């Protein structure tokens, strides 16, 4: 007899519930479900990583050479803290005779060039040649090249659209030919069906049926079999059955031939339908002529504006040099105009003579607690779309320090136009941060590091889903 009290024993329950499923699979399943749920609520930061540097928020003063004589005392040193009115350069006391007339000639050339460049801009704006005479700087030729590009663009788009139109006409012509052929085949199937119906159920066949001769031939064969039977004297049952069997066989063969012909025609129709479905017209008409011409015009005006800016800058430099050239030898010494950190331009270090008006150094604000600095980086054009003013930037100093030096700033400016590098175009991004007192020992202007910009967040579920689907953020 089975003792029911054994059902209440702990050994029974232990053996029943302490199995592989409860000890391994169930915990792993719970862990997996928990991990999936975690991906729906936990967020991952989306970042853009680049290389950046610490730059000043402003330039306190710009230092230029005031004399072309040999330098006899040079106190220029990169990163040096200078006080206001401290001596930076001292020149030989004998003033060097320079050619002022050459500077004046250069100024006249720049003014003439500006006048011709202005005519180019007017020609581009009004879309007609505004040059009264041929200029010596090639700007009229530039406008003629622009007009040639516009005409070439118009001709290319017209040719492209004509090709699309011709292709569509050819496609429609082919479709119509196929449809006509299909209609002919369908009529042939109807003609065969008419004969098939006449053979099967005794219907009539129209006289204009092109396959009437086949039907007449079949009827003639049937009539021959019946005539042979009638010509026999007193045919027995066996002869009658043989004749009937021959008639059925003849009918079956004739119907089979009709069905085979119909199937062949249907196969041809199906093939034509496939051909017709593969013939598609094109709507790829190019309607971008106006926008492309506007783009050409904008590019040409942008290039001329940049050149005008360069000419204005050159003119300003020349006027500065002329003004300096007219000064007495009182400019035999250069002093710091403000207190700050000295940044010597790379090409100046080690020079014994520096032409008048040449920029030689810049003075940056002193680095002290709460000093504002820029975290400047260049972001490739392929990654700039997600970056906005106001986003956070983490800057990590790339040095062997016991503890990583991390600065956090806010993006204040993103250049509207990219800067060209050998590796490609990149946009300058400037973020502002304040230096803490504890960070001062490790911070210098020009210090490079890694910048990480947080451009958004998404759940880990969406992040892994995008990875699987091949989508990029």
Swiss-Prot record:
Cell location: Cell membrane
UniProt entry tagged with the keyword Nucleotide-binding: no
Main location per the UniProt record: membrane
Extracellular topological domain: 45-473
Keywords tagged on the record: Bacteriocin transport, Cell membrane, Membrane, Protein transport, Transmembrane, Transmembrane helix, Transport
PROSITE patterns per record: HLYD_FAMILY
Top-level taxonomic group: Bacteria
Transmembrane segments: 22-44
Record's keyword annotation contains Transmembrane: yes
GO biological process: bacteriocin transport; protein secretion
One Pfam entry name: HlyD_3
Entry GO terms, CC: plasma membrane
Database matches in InterPro entries: MesE/LcnD (IPR005696), MFP (IPR050739), Secretion_HlyD_CS (IPR006144)
Membrane topology value: Single-pass type II membrane protein
Ranges per topology, Cytoplasmic: 1-21
Functional summary from the UniProt entry: Involved in the secretion of a lactococcin.
Family as reported in the entry's similarity comment: Belongs to the membrane fusion protein (MFP) (TC 8.A.1) family.
Protein name: Lactococcin A secretion protein LcnD-like
Species whose genome carries this gene: Lactococcus lactis subsp. lactis (strain IL1403) (Streptococcus lactis)
Gene: lcnD
């Amino acid at each position: 007899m089975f003792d029911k009290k054994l059902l209440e024993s702990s050994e029974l329950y232990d053996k029943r519930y302490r199995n592989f499923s409860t000890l391994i699979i169930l915990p792993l399943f719970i862990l997996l479900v928990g991990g999936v749920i975690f991906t729906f609520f936990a967020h991952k930061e989306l970042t853009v990583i680049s290389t950046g540097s610490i730059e000043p928020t402003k330039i306190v003063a710009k230092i230029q050479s005031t004399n072309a004589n040999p330098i006899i005392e040079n106190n220029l040193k990169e990163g040096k803290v200078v006080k206001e009115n401290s001596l930076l350069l001292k020149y030989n006391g004998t003033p060097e005779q320079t050619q002022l007339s050459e500077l004046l000639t250069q100024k006249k050339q720049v003014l003439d060039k500006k006048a011709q460049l202005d005519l180019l801009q007017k020609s581009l704006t009004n879309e007609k040649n505004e040059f009264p005479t041929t200029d010596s700087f090639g700007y009229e030729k530039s406008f003629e090249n622009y007009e040639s590009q516009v005409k070439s663009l118009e001709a290319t788009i017209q040719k492209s659209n004509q090709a699309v139109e011709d292709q569509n006409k050819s496609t429609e012509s082919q479709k119509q030919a196929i449809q006509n052929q299909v209609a002919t085949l369908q009529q042939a199937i109807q003609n065969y069906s008419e004969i098939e119906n006449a053979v099967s159920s005794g219907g009539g066949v129209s006289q204009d049926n092109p396959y009437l001769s086949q039907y007449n031939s079949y009827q003639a064969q049937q009539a021959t079999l019946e005539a042979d039977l009638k010509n026999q004297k007193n045919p027995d049952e066996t002869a009658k059955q043989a004749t009937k069997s021959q008639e059925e066989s003849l009918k079956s063969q004739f119907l089979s031939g009709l069905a085979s012909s119909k199937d062949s025609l249907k196969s041809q129709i199906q093939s034509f339908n496939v051909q017709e479905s593969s013939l598609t017209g094109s709507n790829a008409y190019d309607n971008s002529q106006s926008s492309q011409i506007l783009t050409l015009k904008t590019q040409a005006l942008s290039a001329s504006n940049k050149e005008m800016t360069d000419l204005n800058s050159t003119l300003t430099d020349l006027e500065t040099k002329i003004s300096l050239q007219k000064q007495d030898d009182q400019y035999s010494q250069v002093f710091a105009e403000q207190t700050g950190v000295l940044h010597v331009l790379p090409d100046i270090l080690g020079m014994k003579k520096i032409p008048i008006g040449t920029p030689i150094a810049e003075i940056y604000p002193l680095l002290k607690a709460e000093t504002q600095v820029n975290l400047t980086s260049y972001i490739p054009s392929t990654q700039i779309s997600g970056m906005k003013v106001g986003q956070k930037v983490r800057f990590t100093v790339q040095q062997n320090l016991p503890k990583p030096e991390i600065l956090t700033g806010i993006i204040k400016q993103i250049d509207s136009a990219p800067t060209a590098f050998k590796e490609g175009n990149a946009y300058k991004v400037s973020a502002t941060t304040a230096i803490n007192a504890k960070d001062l020992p490790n911070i210098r202007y020009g210090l490079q590091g890694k910048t990480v910009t947080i451009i958004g967040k998404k759940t880990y579920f969406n992040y892994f889903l995008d990875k699987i689907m091949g989508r990029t953020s």
